[in-house]
Amino acid sequence: MTEALMERLKTFLNREDNSTLVGSPASQEEIAHAEQRLNVRFHEDYVHFIRTFGGAYAGLAVYAFSNGTSIGKETVVDLTLEFREQLKEHSFAEVLRAGYVISIDGSGDPIVIDQAGKVFICYHDSGEIKLLADSFEALIEDCFYEW
């Protein structure tokens, strides 16, 4: 992720009034264990984000292992395994099997990073899948704004 974007995120998330939006930084051990459990390799931009902020809000809730209290306790592992099981009959099941769920939209649809680093949303009601961004960094650039 660009240094400029990381600085914007740090300035926003380190404000005292935003303390519930940022979690605890992920450890290398947590990341390695999750990658092994999910049989994936996390994209370097996602790793940079969660090693800096943990699970945090950046225009959307980004789940990791220790999330900001306003985000919830589910981890990236919990969400990925849950959606892989729930949506195993959908046409996009392979995307879920090969990727990992980093967020959920307001309708309960998983937002997934695939092994190429592209970000998709999987609509559980219609069975459709849509490309949201070409990378995690592009997703955050599109979604994040300071208030």
Model-flagged regions — what are they?
Residues 129-147:
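Compact, glycine/acidic-enriched structural inserts
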